[in-house]
Amino acid sequence: MTLSPTTADKFTFGLWTVGWTGADPFGVATRAALDPVEAVHKLSELGAYGITFHDNDLVPFDAPASERELILKNFRAALADTGLKVPMVTTNLFSHPVFKDGGFTSNDRSVRRFALSKVLRNIDLAAELGAETFVMWGGREGSEYDGSKDLAAALDRMKEGVDTAAGYIKDKGYNLRIALEPKPNEPRGDIFLPTVGHGLAFIAQLEHGDIVGLNPETGHEQMAGLNFTHGIAQALWAGKLFHIDLNGQRGIKYDQDLVFGHGDLTSAFFTVDLLENGFPGGGPKYDGPRHFDYKPSRTDGYDGVWESAKANMAMYLLLKERALAFRADPEVQEALAASGVFELGEPTLNAGETTADLLADAASFEDFDADKAAERSFAFVRLNQLAIEHLLNAR
């Protein structure tokens, strides 16, 4: 397979990624600001499918209407010239000081009303640009001090905000779905809806949960010490993997936003294996964009920025090649069977069997030899060794 990306790969980048100037809490920018039009053209040249943005990545927070219209006109022209898509749009409810205590969950009601109005206006923009997903990351929705929030009220306000936005989408007839992006902390000490599991539980309480799903990010789940592949698998199983953010992370620390695969490489391999091959026994598959949410190293100039963009796509394609070979290997299929992976796909109860039938089945309890069953070797290490050998292109 070719390692040159094409639009068929559906690789997308946030404007805030390649446009990150390198400013962080400890230092100022190391690169000049990037013109969004240049970003569109350069990403198109590199083989990307699309570009995404927060509203204020594209249009400054306090831009007058005339400036906003000019920026959008130039951006739309660049999209038309290149054919680059805008599959996802999101709203910045975290940078301006007005959002220091959150947007949807601020203790200040006037701020909540402003935040919700800002979101609704950007839903309109997302629809105008043909986006199919509207991501909500509540970076400031949380606290540092447990006594500073009525937690039930905060969740009520979060529900109110998401349901209002989802209801607006339905009322307008937009072809849009909302994807919530979990993160455990940073910038807040503790962020509401910190993991995929929290997000799924929250969605179950929504009035319009049918069009609300998740946008899990590699580093965010790994910051919480969780298995990213398990997280996206559960979201996919629940029919709620609406979007995905790929990057690299090395352990439980700050959000590193490394190039995809430059952190936990084995985890990245199994993530791509799931995205490209699906579950071993079949079931739902992800068909959305492969979105890179990372930060180019602040040690590099813009030559390094574009190299890092290419690196994300190359890493994914390399891992895709290895994952396809892994699943196609007859020895791997034999190892999967020997380890009972396919057996797990068989229902525990027989067709039509009741609990009374199960309790009456002596073979399942009275005559079951637990000691004998405990002797089974599942050979999981052998299976994983095969995966690593494929990952290293040693097979």
From Swiss-Prot:
Cofactor: how and how many bound: Binds 2 magnesium ions per subunit.
Catalytic residues in the record: 54, 57
An annotated GO cellular component: cytoplasm
Protein keywords: Carbohydrate metabolism, Cytoplasm, Isomerase, Magnesium, Metal-binding, Xylose metabolism
Enzyme class label: isomerase
Catalytic activity field: alpha-D-xylose = alpha-D-xylulofuranose
One GO term of the biological process aspect: D-xylose metabolic process
Compartments, record wording: Cytoplasm
Requisite cofactors: Mg(2+)
GO molecular function: magnesium ion binding; xylose isomerase activity
Membrane spanning stretches: none
InterPro entries xrefs: Xyl_isomerase-like_sf, Xyl_isomerase-like_TIM-brl, XylA_actinobac, Xylose_isomerase
Binding-site positions, Mg(2+) 1: 181, 217, 245, 293
EC numbers: 5.3.1.5
Binding site for Mg(2+) 2: 217, 220, 255, 257
Family the UniProt entry places it in: Belongs to the xylose isomerase family.
Subunit structure: Homotetramer.
Name by which UniProt lists this protein: Xylose isomerase
